[in-house]
UniProtKB/Swiss-Prot annotation:
A GO molecular-function annotation: exodeoxyribonuclease VII activity
Cross-referenced InterPro entries: Exonuc_VII_S, Exonuc_VII_ssu_sf
Signal sequence segment: none
Reactions catalysed, as given in the entry: Exonucleolytic cleavage in either 5'- to 3'- or 3'- to 5'-direction to yield nucleoside 5'-phosphates
Organism of origin: Streptococcus pneumoniae serotype 4 (strain ATCC BAA-334 / TIGR4)
Keyword Lipid metabolism applies: no
Cellular compartments annotated: Cytoplasm
Family: Belongs to the XseB family.
Function, as annotated: Bidirectionally degrades single-stranded DNA into large acid-insoluble oligonucleotides, which are then degraded further into small acid-soluble oligonucleotides.
Identification of the protein by name: Exodeoxyribonuclease 7 small subunit
Pfam family, one: Exonuc_VII_S
Length: 70
């Protein structure tokens, strides 16, 4: 079983991909592959953030202090 990357590792990898695409010194085929990888990472990061938000909302609701998280 492979260890799933941490949020921070995925974010750092996404930032590296964005920088390489922005500098324009990457071959087209590599840019397409990097873009696709970046989209996957972006979706994974968003899912992690959504899960964290739901967890916080649940904790706050159980505590009785807040019922909506925005």
């Amino acid at each position: 079983m492979s260890k799933q990357k941490k949020f921070e590792e995925n974010l750092a990898e996404l930032e590296t991909i964005v920088q390489s695409l922005e500098n324009g010194e990457i071959a087209l085929e590599d840019a397409i592959t990097a873009f696709q990888k970046g989209m996957v990472l972006s979706k994974e990061l968003q899912a992690t953030l959504d899960k964290a938000e739901k967890t916080l909302v649940k904790v706050m609701q159980e505590d009785g202090t807040e019922s909506d998280f925005e």
